[in-house]
């Protein structure tokens, strides 16, 4: 059964009316209601607020990494473990084909259903997850296979065990190593891009965001709690933080925004997957014509342009 957000109540009502009309066999009413539904969807999604886009980024029905892997990757084989501690299921790694191109996909997976969410720690990786991602990235470099990173996490796990095993070192190591990979790399924020947990697999030649995804240094709730001591002010924090794809594109922090189906990726996963696949194919066609040493140098220059600082 579909889940609806607060601002989708009118859409929910029309959907329910359509179901009732179908049960009654009233084809004329169904036809009219479907036209009304299209108008309501267009009206609702035309001018979404930043907070509404945040809600969409967290929508429980939104496609996750494994959904996209199933939809866009052929002959997919999962790669497990960091070869040091354990296999962190919050990060998944697959080798397969995108069309006729070999590709490795590394992404964060939140999980569906209570048991799966707990097993995957709600998409919050431990350090061994980031070390698994780095191991697979090095494997990709060894065999000259491009990488697609799919980012979707509230953030890196802040628990005691994660800190004891070197969470900050694992993230920093990934930033260092991924910035110098001698292969084409693409990163896409498909839902939430939570701080260092997202950056740890977000260093790439192309960084894009789905239209209804977000990317921030802290959650709006966390920001509101710190600035105003009131998590209820998260809507104001969301707007002030400029977390949306359009905001980050206008500031030059990402390269591209990938359009979603009109009513969000959660309503048409197949169309969202096609949009991602098309973007990746287009980007790879461009990147594969650039010498790998030049790719690495360009990536480093791109990183150095971020933020405002002065060298001593």
UniProtKB/Swiss-Prot annotation:
<dbReference type="GO" id="GO:0005524">
    <property type="term" value="F:ATP binding"/>
</dbReference>
<dbReference type="InterPro" id="IPR029045">
    <property type="entry name" value="ClpP/crotonase-like_dom_sf"/>
</dbReference>
<dbReference type="InterPro" id="IPR011763">
    <property type="entry name" value="COA_CT_C"/>
</dbReference>
<keyword id="KW-0963">Cytoplasm</keyword>
<keyword id="KW-0443">Lipid metabolism</keyword>
<dbReference type="Pfam" id="PF03255">
    <property type="entry name" value="ACCA"/>
</dbReference>
<dbReference type="GO" id="GO:0016743">
    <property type="term" value="F:carboxyl- or carbamoyltransferase activity"/>
</dbReference>
<keyword id="KW-0067">ATP-binding</keyword>
<dbReference type="GO" id="GO:0006633">
    <property type="term" value="P:fatty acid biosynthetic process"/>
</dbReference>
<comment type="subunit">
    <text>Acetyl-CoA carboxylase is a heterohexamer composed of biotin carboxyl carrier protein (AccB), biotin carboxylase (AccC) and two subunits each of ACCase subunit alpha (AccA) and ACCase subunit beta (AccD).</text>
</comment>
<keyword id="KW-0808">Transferase</keyword>
<dbReference type="GO" id="GO:0009317">
    <property type="term" value="C:acetyl-CoA carboxylase complex"/>
</dbReference>
<feature type="domain" description="CoA carboxyltransferase C-terminal">
    <location>
        <begin position="36"/>
        <end position="286"/>
    </location>
</feature>
<keyword id="KW-0547">Nucleotide-binding</keyword>
<dbReference type="InterPro" id="IPR001095">
    <property type="entry name" value="Acetyl_CoA_COase_a_su"/>
</dbReference>
<comment type="pathway">
    <text>Lipid metabolism; malonyl-CoA biosynthesis; malonyl-CoA from acetyl-CoA: step 1/1.</text>
</comment>
<keyword id="KW-0444">Lipid biosynthesis</keyword>
<comment type="function">
    <text>Component of the acetyl coenzyme A carboxylase (ACC) complex. First, biotin carboxylase catalyzes the carboxylation of biotin on its carrier protein (BCCP) and then the CO(2) group is transferred by the carboxyltransferase to acetyl-CoA to form malonyl-CoA.</text>
</comment>
<dbReference type="GO" id="GO:0003989">
    <property type="term" value="F:acetyl-CoA carboxylase activity"/>
</dbReference>
<dbReference type="GO" id="GO:2001295">
    <property type="term" value="P:malonyl-CoA biosynthetic process"/>
</dbReference>
<protein>
    <recommendedName>
        <fullName>Acetyl-coenzyme A carboxylase carboxyl transferase subunit alpha</fullName>
        <ecNumber>2.1.3.15</ecNumber>
    </recommendedName>
</protein>
<comment type="similarity">
    <text>Belongs to the AccA family.</text>
</comment>
<keyword id="KW-0276">Fatty acid metabolism</keyword>
<keyword id="KW-0275">Fatty acid biosynthesis</keyword>
